[in-house]
């Protein structure tokens, strides 16, 4: 199978689904950790602007991750659709939590870097730049909305721009690593066939 051809549903082996399951466990742990830190620490800036929205977004993220643990076991819906829904939900929930925490100074925007890298590697790089563009649009919209709604908020478009560039850099790196991995895997299969015959 050439590197540029599409992957059919039958090509998604247990390894793909196991990677998606571990990625979802990471998502569950991050969401749970954010909730625990926001409940236990009175010094955390998490939810500093709108704590109730932060809690709802965090609980929604954890529940959504828990639901997908079951759906991954059932393998419903398909692999690409599950991955896309999970990453887009990460972007949506983290954007809400970022807004509820007072914007970019909370540091929550960096969490999407890990999510984008993981998704890029799991998808074998095919959707990585798409996810980075969605995250960038969401970040810029969140920053603009924060400027309009939070009193005395200083827009940090330069920081948002740098973080957006980091999103694309991580997505591109994941894309390149995934292509390299696929090429190595294909070469190993060819050499395995050569040794057998």
Give names to the regions the model predicted.
Residues 92-102, 110-128:
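Generic transmembrane alpha-helix motif of multi-pass integral membrane proteins
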Residues 20-24, 80-108:
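Individual alpha-helical transmembrane segments in multi-pass integral membrane proteins
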Residues 1-82, 191:
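N-terminal juxtamembrane segment and adjoining first transmembrane helix
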Residues 27, 87, 114, 131-133:
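Residue-level recognition of transmembrane alpha-helices
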Residues 12-14, 76-77, 88-89, 109-112, ...:
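Short hydrophobic/aromatic segments of transmembrane alpha-helices and their interfaces
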Residues 173, 177-197:
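Amphipathic coiled-coil signal-transmission "stalk" helices
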Residues 32-59, 74-85, 102-105, 122-180:
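Alpha-helical transmembrane segments and their interfaces in multipass membrane proteins
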């Amino acid at each position: 199978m050439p590197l540029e051809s599409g992957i059919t549903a039958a090509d998604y082996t247990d390894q793909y689904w196991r990677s998606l399951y571990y990625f979802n466990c990471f998502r569950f742990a991050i969401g749970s950790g954010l909730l625990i830190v926001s409940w236990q620490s009175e010094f955390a800036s998490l939810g500093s602007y709108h704590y109730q929205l932060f809690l709802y977004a965090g609980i929604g993220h954890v529940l959504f991750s828990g639901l997908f643990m079951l759906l991954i076991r059932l393998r419903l819906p398909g692999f690409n659709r599950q991955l896309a829904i999970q990453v887009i939900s990460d972007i949506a929930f983290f954007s809400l939590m970022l807004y509820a925490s007072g914007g970019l100074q909370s540091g929550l925007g960096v969490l999407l870097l890990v999510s984008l890298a993981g998704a890029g590697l799991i998808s074998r790089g095919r959707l990585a730049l798409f996810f980075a563009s969605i995250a960038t649009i969401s970040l810029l919209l969140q920053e603009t909305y924060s400027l309009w709604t939070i009193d005395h908020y200083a827009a940090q478009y330069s920081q948002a721009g740098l973080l957006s560039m980091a999103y694309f850099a991580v997505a591109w790196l994941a894309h390149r690593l995934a292509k390299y991995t696929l090429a190595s895997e294909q070469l190993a299969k060819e050499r395995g066939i050569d040794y057998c015959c």
